[in-house]
Curated annotation (Swiss-Prot):
The lineage of its organism: Viruses, Monodnaviria, Shotokuvirae, Cossaviricota, Papovaviricetes. InterPro entries: Capsid_L1_Papillomavir, Capsid_L1_sf_Papillomavir, dsDNA_vir_gr_I_capsid. This is Major capsid protein L1. Belongs to the papillomaviridae L1 protein family. The gene is L1. It is found in: Virion; Host nucleus. GO terms for cellular component: host cell nucleus; T=7 icosahedral viral capsid. Forms an icosahedral capsid with a T=7 symmetry and a 50 nm diameter. The capsid is composed of 72 pentamers linked to each other by disulfide bonds and associated with L2 proteins. Binds to heparan sulfate proteoglycans on cell surface of basal layer keratinocytes to provide initial virion attachment. This binding mediates a conformational change in the virus capsid that facilitates efficient infection. The virion enters the host cell via endocytosis. During virus trafficking, L1 protein dissociates from the viral DNA and the genomic DNA is released to the host nucleus. Keywords: Capsid protein, Disulfide bond, Host nucleus, Host-virus interaction, Late protein, T=7 icosahedral capsid protein, Viral attachment to host cell, Viral penetration into host cytoplasm, Virion, Virus endocytosis by host, Virus entry into host cell.
Amino acid sequence: MSVWLPASGKVYLPPSTPVAKVQSTDEYIQRTNIFYHAYSDRLLTVGHPYFNVYNNDGTVLEVPKVSGNQHRVFRLKLPDPNRFALADMSVYNPEKERLVWGCRGVEIGRGQPLGVGTSGHPLFNKVNDTENPVSYRTQASSTDDRQNTSFDPKQIQMFIIGCAPCIGEHWEVAERCAGDNNDAGRCPPIKLVNSVIQDGDMADIGYGNLNFRTLQQSRSDVSLDIVNETCKYPDFLKMQNDVYGDSCFFFARREQCYARHFFVRGGKPGDDIPGEQIDAGTYKNDFYIPAATGQTQKNIGNSMYFPTVSGSLVSSDAQLFNRPFWLQRAQGHNNGICWANQLFITVVDNTRNTNFSISVYTENGKVTDINEYDANKFREYQRHVEEYEISLILQLCKIPLKADVLAQINAMNPSLLEEWQLGFVPAPDNPLQSTYRYIESLATPCPDKVAPKEREDPYAPYTFWNVDLSERLSLELDQYSLGRKFLFQAGLVQKTSKKTSNVSKGTKRKRT
């Protein structure tokens, strides 16, 4: 029998129109055939590889922290192309168009030789070697079994390019719920936090991306360079799904590590193995079978295992730096357009991680007068240096001042329209104005003390390595290394042809 029955499944309907859609920059930006080469000076930085060095009072920073495991975030300031006096004024119409920069190529130069740098802690929480144990050790021999331990960090090469700062992620302490037990010694809840990666922020060296200051209160579980820091890792998932794609045009990375040694922590385990818990036999013998009375294994040892990582071989065969990268299509909607005339380059490279050891004689006299070596008469210092050089290929692009284009730019960043001076120009006021002679006297009205408000920098609270390229642009691409590479790969190099000359042969005389 044929009867009507209710539908058992859900019906999916299309979204109601209109649907908001973000256009790609390629849909409304017109690219010209004018290219510029931009380059920076040799960028150098020197400091201590593990911590900041202050004076005796702790008020003056004498030596900054400069580590090979830090992020270097360059904020490149580009000139305003709308202020350029172009030789060909037919390139764009200033009444209907505006000019912007498009990044087409980049080369991040690194100086200094390859080298491996070590890090460590003089009081490292390492109780026992669990890779090759000699005897079963159930507990620490004293209340403090920390050791002086060092290791080489995870090897990492990475750079991220965008017109907005790179977004990082790390784990942080989260707030407890109102009804949770907040007894001392309980493990806190943790949450994933997004933040801007700034110049000097530590990268992950093999111990995770978390706030070690708040989550490791023993101050002995990691090395000195990160024990009081927050290690960040770029949030590639968030940047790849960004609706505008400003934080990451493209990136390149190479990471490698392996576990070199295997240790166990000291201290009380916060989470007992379920086999130890009195739970009416629920977990009996699920994880281990108890040892007999009188055996050393009767008191089970600590289970807080961890490795010390190693970055392994550093080789010039796998370098991301000192080579050009060309941008044809970005991963997001922004295909290399440098909004607000700026570019952010986030770099991590610890393949040039050599830490200099500098020894200084502390006594009066010369080193040549020493008869016997005495270690107490020498003071040892450590320094780390870094060397960078950045080159860019910029393409001149123009934006039509149409309603739909301006609407999207206004929704994305309204300050861009203010820089382009697109506001309505009001009619001039009455030309006759009042001017007081003795404006500072008590007899006249108080002058306006409110200074005109300057445009606020949205990235003022953050720390970057500012590089001014406003006077470092050139049209002579063939005069620079990256420019010649760009001309060659784009097929714009003029091939010189050899001139051939026809030589007329002389007539041969007949013998008579």
